[in-house]
Amino acid sequence: MPRAETTQSRQTIQGPTAAERARTLAYGVADGVLVAPGVPYAPVPAHTTDRDGRPLLLVRADAPIAAALAGEDDVPATLRISDVAPVPLPDRVRGRAWLHGWLSEVPDGEMRAAALRLSHAHPRPELLDLGAERDGRREWTILALEAAQVEVEDAWGSATLEPEEYAAAAPDPFVAVEAGVLTHLDSAHRGELPRLLPRSVPPGPVRPLGLDRYGMWLRCSAPPPDAPSSFDVRLPFAEPVSDLHGLRRVYRRLFARATP
């Protein structure tokens, strides 16, 4: 990841805690890969978390990881998550998380609730008929990961979390809409973004990189040969926001101040 800078000293900037950042990455927007000993790893078709942050993973019933659970209550596994910026940029990976724990199949009595939870983030047709069978076998199932340890690494730094700290946090309120907001800013307001930055930042192209309730990350670069590499700048909001109404209000203030 490019180096990160802020428009204030890091000590005075409010931002999400490591646990909140981990919960945001695990929410299900970022892609995940499931890794277990002796099992070929593969991308997870869809995943999300329940209210306590427990990952719920949709997999084919004949997938190697599902076969590894045959006759077992659970198996050790790690969910690896890579957070990629929705705006097309070089070096788009914004952060990573690793959730280590014990993987098991969701009991039949809890399968419907888990499918509904998954459908909020991923409205896939497979979730409508999880009980459907072909040749006497279920085609899809949902697995749950009980986290024993969580690691997160991003522009804020790296941290290792206990499961209680992770479960007590909440994902960012804009996790489900961030991609749409950033792509809109990039397509409709890219020319205005440089005016949001302080004069200390060298002039050059600016693209939206990240959004959370405390502020934005902007990807900055200067025309060559002045800056051979890009760098990221944190633009903090005056106060945290919790909904789209508050976000629109903050944006109006930012762009009003930036208008020449």
Q: Locations of the language-model features?
A:
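Short, structured beta-strand-loop surface elements
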Residues: 61-125, 149, 224-233
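Short beta-strand micro-motifs enriched in acidic
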Residues: 49-50, 106, 221
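An N-terminal domain-cap segment
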Residues: 2-70
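C-terminal edge-of-domain segments
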Residues: 1-4, 114-260
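Conserved hydrophobic/aromatic beta-strand scaffold that supports enzyme active sites
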Residues: 31-33, 98-100, 142-144
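A general structural signal for short secondary-structure junctions and capping/turn motifs
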Residues: 24-26, 69-71, 89-90, 133-137, ...
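Catalytic micro-motifs at enzyme active sites that drive phosphoryl/nucleotidyl and oxygen chemistry
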Residues: 21, 42-46, 65-67, 84-90, ...
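A generic structural signal for beta-strand entry/edge sites
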Residues: 52-58, 76, 140-142, 213-215
